[in-house]
């Protein structure tokens, strides 16, 4: 009982942090050491390529800003990531890098005015502070990272009085760090776009109050208007509509929803008004589970990555020993041109940093997983990517993978001798201009492609019938457009629809046009193949 009461008092929240100080997997243990000492942190995970730390914490005990403070005490440069941030903000280099670069360029004019040579030293001082701070933090944790190795190289270069070269090392390292941070930021945007699929607010049907989805419990009835995203998984208890489920299923054709129909968060109500009784909490919805799967896949390590991480423990000391040998052995052997050997030692020290080796595999894996996620593919782990090299048979889902998941009109015909094709297409496209259905967009585009310009202003009494079609009065005619069920609403008593369907090819969606109770036209919609699919399948077979 005591344990149950304690869990009720907790208010767990998942927060996302951008941690610029994570340059490779060796910093994961540093993050772990910091967060394990923080009271209120229940669990955490680190995604190295995007420099993301995900923390589940009790907000009664610790806030996201306090977690940031704890991480920054270890010089990890952490910040709270706004929920669902999807806009790519332009990131400028740090002021240290900019000032260092300007002074370095000015120092190159020393050949015209020799005192400008000293600007190189000022460039080192201006740009070395971030490197120095991170290097000190690394050494105090008994670790040698790229910042410590670079700082040693800069100090040694200054001792050799190669001021311009020292400034160049500082500037190039700062620029490289900025480019890496920008790449990590772009990667994190992908994860944020998945998080933002579902809305963060829901409207309670009984009161009309708008609340956070995290506050909505199970069996709560929420209302969803036309054009809005469904906030939480549930069952329709009132109303009807067509729902676009393309974000989750990849299927381009909207699904009709009636009473007792199941709906999912992040899908879009295209028309109609519905009330939904929730069947899950926001954190347990399908879209939340999908995001969780992607996070787990990004955190998982491939066999190659685990092997590289294991080797990297011994790689850094080996680099330092190798650099020391290049510097010390020539001195012991009393060889000439010692400055050349010192220079080689510095090259080994800087270029031999393990960060590039450690990051190579996880970055490639991360890019593959995130690109797949945004394209509609969920890959369980990084090991699955390595397994792809050994597969013999591939099975593809058609919609959204082989096809574009967008409708296009493949056939449009008039079934009445008294109504020509252009006249019928003019009526249909004008009425469909008032509809938000994906089928409407395809018909409008088709009309314009054959030089028929729709005029929605002349359409009267437009009505939408979810799961059936639409109605509009134009030029004195009552026009019904939709699927087979629209016939009954149009007053058609003869069952001539199956005869038309028998002439259609499989894989096409069939639409019907009624003028009053008379069937006057039909059209076919299909989901066209993606560009390059045939070539891709041919290459896979080869």
From Swiss-Prot:
<dbReference type="GO" id="GO:0005524">
    <property type="term" value="F:ATP binding"/>
</dbReference>
<dbReference type="InterPro" id="IPR001757">
    <property type="entry name" value="P_typ_ATPase"/>
</dbReference>
<feature type="topological domain" description="Extracellular">
    <location>
        <position position="163"/>
    </location>
</feature>
<dbReference type="GO" id="GO:0071585">
    <property type="term" value="P:detoxification of cadmium ion"/>
</dbReference>
<feature type="transmembrane region" description="Helical">
    <location>
        <begin position="342"/>
        <end position="359"/>
    </location>
</feature>
<dbReference type="Pfam" id="PF00122">
    <property type="entry name" value="E1-E2_ATPase"/>
</dbReference>
<feature type="topological domain" description="Cytoplasmic">
    <location>
        <begin position="185"/>
        <end position="310"/>
    </location>
</feature>
<dbReference type="InterPro" id="IPR018303">
    <property type="entry name" value="ATPase_P-typ_P_site"/>
</dbReference>
<dbReference type="InterPro" id="IPR023298">
    <property type="entry name" value="ATPase_P-typ_TM_dom_sf"/>
</dbReference>
<dbReference type="GO" id="GO:0005774">
    <property type="term" value="C:vacuolar membrane"/>
</dbReference>
<comment type="similarity">
    <text>Belongs to the cation transport ATPase (P-type) (TC 3.A.3) family. Type IB subfamily.</text>
</comment>
<feature type="transmembrane region" description="Helical">
    <location>
        <begin position="90"/>
        <end position="111"/>
    </location>
</feature>
<keyword id="KW-0472">Membrane</keyword>
<feature type="topological domain" description="Cytoplasmic">
    <location>
        <begin position="135"/>
        <end position="141"/>
    </location>
</feature>
<feature type="domain" description="HMA">
    <location>
        <begin position="13"/>
        <end position="79"/>
    </location>
</feature>
<dbReference type="InterPro" id="IPR008250">
    <property type="entry name" value="ATPase_P-typ_transduc_dom_A_sf"/>
</dbReference>
<protein>
    <recommendedName>
        <fullName>Putative inactive cadmium/zinc-transporting ATPase HMA3</fullName>
    </recommendedName>
</protein>
<feature type="topological domain" description="Extracellular">
    <location>
        <begin position="334"/>
        <end position="341"/>
    </location>
</feature>
<dbReference type="GO" id="GO:0046872">
    <property type="term" value="F:metal ion binding"/>
</dbReference>
<dbReference type="InterPro" id="IPR023214">
    <property type="entry name" value="HAD_sf"/>
</dbReference>
<feature type="topological domain" description="Cytoplasmic">
    <location>
        <begin position="1"/>
        <end position="89"/>
    </location>
</feature>
<dbReference type="Pfam" id="PF00702">
    <property type="entry name" value="Hydrolase"/>
</dbReference>
<feature type="topological domain" description="Extracellular">
    <location>
        <begin position="112"/>
        <end position="114"/>
    </location>
</feature>
<feature type="transmembrane region" description="Helical">
    <location>
        <begin position="164"/>
        <end position="184"/>
    </location>
</feature>
<dbReference type="InterPro" id="IPR027256">
    <property type="entry name" value="P-typ_ATPase_IB"/>
</dbReference>
<keyword id="KW-1133">Transmembrane helix</keyword>
<dbReference type="InterPro" id="IPR036163">
    <property type="entry name" value="HMA_dom_sf"/>
</dbReference>
<feature type="transmembrane region" description="Helical">
    <location>
        <begin position="311"/>
        <end position="333"/>
    </location>
</feature>
<dbReference type="GO" id="GO:0019829">
    <property type="term" value="F:ATPase-coupled monoatomic cation transmembrane transporter activity"/>
</dbReference>
<feature type="transmembrane region" description="Helical">
    <location>
        <begin position="142"/>
        <end position="162"/>
    </location>
</feature>
<feature type="topological domain" description="Cytoplasmic">
    <location>
        <begin position="360"/>
        <end position="542"/>
    </location>
</feature>
<dbReference type="InterPro" id="IPR051014">
    <property type="entry name" value="Cation_Transport_ATPase_IB"/>
</dbReference>
<dbReference type="InterPro" id="IPR023299">
    <property type="entry name" value="ATPase_P-typ_cyto_dom_N"/>
</dbReference>
<feature type="transmembrane region" description="Helical">
    <location>
        <begin position="115"/>
        <end position="134"/>
    </location>
</feature>
<keyword id="KW-0812">Transmembrane</keyword>
<dbReference type="InterPro" id="IPR006121">
    <property type="entry name" value="HMA_dom"/>
</dbReference>
<dbReference type="GO" id="GO:0016887">
    <property type="term" value="F:ATP hydrolysis activity"/>
</dbReference>
